[in-house]
């Protein structure tokens, strides 16, 4: 049985690095992998890129008003065994349900990588839907500069923490 899996964490917790490693491992074993990210995510253009500048090309840039089941994406999905979704916090609940359907009705392994919350501690809508629909949830952690496990994203302007915006 295939699952919808979520890897989530704060900024710099290694979410995209995990995606890139998963991509490498699945492809090494001969699996057909599709990489997707929301169109709204401008970092890296049509690639997923981590903080050490490792990258992989994106197969689908998915707009918020699009469905993964749109006719233009069906040929790409056909024969796919694994879908990796970067920056999944920007997806809509409808899109999360579609990825759940791909896993449970079509038999494609779907793995999403997402920020848990914004700098105010509020869950992103895509992450909230994933927490509800994902079969497996895995937190990735990173140490804060204070040495403890980071639990929030910080927002800084000109070197100072800000709490508005």
PLM feature segments, named:
Residues 1-74, 118-129, 139-142:
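Conserved P-loop
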Residues 29-31, 78-79, 134-135:
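Short glycine/proline-enriched coil/turn segments at helix->beta-strand junctions
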Residues 4-6, 32-34, 81-84, 109-111:
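Residue-level preference for the first positions of well-ordered beta-strands
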Residues 73-76, 81, 151-153:
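Hydrophobic transmembrane alpha-helix bundles
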Residues 19, 86, 134:
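Residue-level signature of catalytic and energy-coupling elements of molecular machines
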């Amino acid at each position: 049985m295939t699952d919808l899996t979520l890897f989530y964490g704060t900024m710099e917790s290694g979410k995209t690095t995990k995606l890139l490693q998963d991509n490498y491992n699945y492809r090494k074993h001969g699996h057909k992998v599709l990489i997707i990210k929301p169109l709204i995510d401008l970092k890296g253009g049509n690639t997923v890129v981590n903080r050490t500048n490792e990258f992989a090309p994106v197969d689908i840039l998915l707009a918020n008003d699009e469905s993964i089941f749109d006719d233009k994406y069906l040929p790409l999905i056909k024969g796919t065994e694994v879908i990796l979704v970067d920056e999944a916090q920007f997806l809509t609940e409808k899109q999360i349900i579609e990825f759940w359907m791909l896993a449970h009705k079509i038999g494609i392994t779907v793995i999403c990588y997402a920020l848990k919350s914004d700098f105010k501690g509020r869950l992103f809508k895509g992450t909230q839907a994933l927490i509800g629909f994902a079969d497996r949830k895995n937190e990735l952690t990173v140490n804060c500069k204070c040495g403890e496990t980071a639990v929030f994203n910080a927002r800084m302007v000109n070197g100072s923490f800000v709490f508005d915006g």
